[in-house]
Regions:
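N-terminal hydrophobic/helix-forming segments and targeting peptides
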Residues: 2-4, 8-378
Length: 378
């Protein structure tokens, strides 16, 4: 079992941890992959994923045996034209966004949310508005705290109490630049915090989309797996796992692995009794629960042991809030596993991950794919 150790009074599967000091990837060997940076730079709120889709195509199509964009906009990159089993790897390329709902007489843009925002984090952010004429810069605003009563200061503003300022003098001037239904994203780019810890908007789930496609690229260059592999960059996950519903029908997998971010709880104000203990740099988070096929989970554990990859185990008693919930029940059911990338500050403009965890996720998927035997069923 290498450096695996057991925590006292727990079953091995609940406490399987690889000693971090012996397995953590050297920070000096970790460089942000250009593919990942391109995905993060792409603006792709749910339903408006064109920029991210173009990035996936330009990085993956030349390595795939086939590359298909379905009617909803999911990208399907396949390795192996036929094969049993078919392994689906899924990560979503959409991100949180804002959508313009109203333009006032004074030229201010009122908006609603695409996806689940923390309203307390919205005001004072620079945003890019995606229009048919190009990008329009703006800043989110609300009434200054100095102009609020004591009671008003205690309340989080509703969406209709905030706006985007693009510097327009009136409605007509604003309409020359934007229109109702245009989407916007925060302008918060990639930065290195310390060693392998990095911050950006939209690691949820550009990091997962990078991981599934990078796994396919590595499988294309090394020894080919016995199975067919389909890396799917799904869309509209943030508004109800919609892309996963349609893509699972086209991919028609025998087994699936979904990669999404998962809450790291190694920060203040996280109750481990309620949320569990998960840390950046601790390795991929593997979920157990009704949404997860036990055989797929066990195979992931075996692959992690083989590659000496540290893993963290999460229990979820409900359908997870990921594409796994949709893929598991597609067609006549799909044995599904869920791999989490530990992340701090989810659904904010500044999400933090460890690049070492991301690399471990890619390695784990590559090993899983190569472990599948021809005709194998779960």
């Amino acid at each position: 079992m290498g450096n695996w150790k057991l925590l006292p009074n727990r079953s091995w599967v609940d406490s399987l941890i690889l000693m971090k000091k012996k397995t953590k990837t050297s920070a000096t060997s970790l460089k942000p992959p250009a593919f990942l940076l391109d995905l993060l730079n792409a603006r792709s709120p749910s339903g408006y994923e064109e920029e991210a889709r173009d990035v996936v195509r330009s990085n993956v199509e030349k390595y795939a045996d086939s590359f298909v964009v379905d009617n909803l906009g999911n990208c399907h990159a396949s390795l192996g034209k036929t094969g049993s089993p078919t392994l689906m790897l899924a990560g979503h390329i959409d991100e949180l966004g804002l959508i313009i709902k109203h333009i006032s007489d004074k030229g201010f843009l009122y908006f609603d949310a695409i996806g689940g925002h923390d309203r307390s984090m919205i005001s004072g952010r620079r945003v890019d508005i995606l229009t048919s004429k190009g990008t329009v810069r703006g800043v989110t605003g609300k009434r200054a705290i100095h102009l609020m009563s004591i009671e008003e200061r205690k309340r989080v503003p509703e969406f209709h109490q905030m706006w985007i300022d693009i510097g327009a003098s009136n409605r007509e001037e604003a309409l020359e630049r934007v229109m109702i239904g245009d989407a916007a994203v925060y302008d918060h780019g990639f930065e290195i915090l310390n060693d392998s810890l990095v911050v950006s908007r939209a690691f949820d789930d550009k990091s997962g989309a990078y991981a599934v496609n990078e796994a396919l690229l590595r499988l294309s260059k090394g020894s080919k797996p016995s199975c067919k592999v389909v890396a799917v960059s799904t869309v509209q996950e943030e508004i109800g796992t919609r892309g996963a519903i349609s893509s699972a029908h086209l991919a028609d997998p025998d087994v699936a692995l979904v990669v999404d971010v998962s809450h790291a709880t190694d920060h203040p104000d996280a109750d481990h009794r309620k949320y569990g203990r998960f840390c950046l740099g601790g390795g991929p988070i593997l979920t157990r629960g009704p949404n997860i096929h036990p055989g797929v989970f066990e195979r992931l554990i075996q692959c992690a042991k083989k590659e000496k990859i540290s893993v963290q185990i999460e229990a979820d008693p409900r359908p997870t809030g990921t594409d796994a919930r949709a893929i598991q029940v597609a067609r006549n059911g799909v044995p599904t596993g869920l791999i989490g990338i530990p992340l701090r500050y989810m659904h904010t403009p500044s999400e933090v991950i460890d690049l070492g965890d991301l690399e471990a996720v890619v390695r784990l998927m590559v090993t899983f794919a190569r472990s599948l035997k021809k005709g194998e069923k779960f």
